[in-house]
Amino acid sequence: SALFLAMHYTPDTLTAFSSVTHICRDVNYGWLIRYIHANGASLFFICLYLHIGRGIYYGSYSYMETWNIGIILLFLTMA
């Protein structure tokens, strides 16, 4: 869904809001693509936090190299 949104979105500060309005009103099922993208991104981060919680619960933080690589990947995902 991100690819379809990127085809119509403009990141310029003056036209960003109007491009989102264009996606929701003028693109066929643009409103649906936008909501699927937003909910999919939220679900992705919920799964990411659950995965971290599972690692904390099972004591995976004791494997320092693996844990640090995971933290770096988390920060890169959020950047």
Curated annotation (Swiss-Prot):
Q: Species name for this entry?
A: Dipodomys panamintinus (Panamint kangaroo rat)
Beyond the main fields, what else does the record say? Heme 1 (or BL or b562) is low-potential and absorbs at about 562 nm, and heme 2 (or BH or b566) is high-potential and absorbs at about 566 nm.
Alphabetically sorted, this entry's keywords are: Electron transport, Heme, Iron, Membrane, Metal-binding, Mitochondrion, Mitochondrion inner membrane, Respiratory chain, Transmembrane, Transmembrane helix, Transport, Ubiquinone
Disulfide pairs? none
Q: Does the keyword Electron transport apply?
A: yes
Q: Which GO terms describe its molecular function?
A: metal ion binding; ubiquinol-cytochrome-c reductase activity
Sequence positions that bind heme b b566: 51
**Underlying gene:** MT-CYB
Localization (cell): Mitochondrion inner membrane
**Record-stated family:** Belongs to the cytochrome b family.
The alphabetized list of GO BP terms reads: mitochondrial electron transport, ubiquinol to cytochrome c
The name this protein carries in UniProt is Cytochrome b
Q: Kindly list the GO CC terms recorded for this protein.
A: mitochondrial inner membrane
**What is this organism's lineage?**
Eukaryota, Metazoa, Chordata, Craniata, Vertebrata
Q: What is its main location?
A: mitochondrion
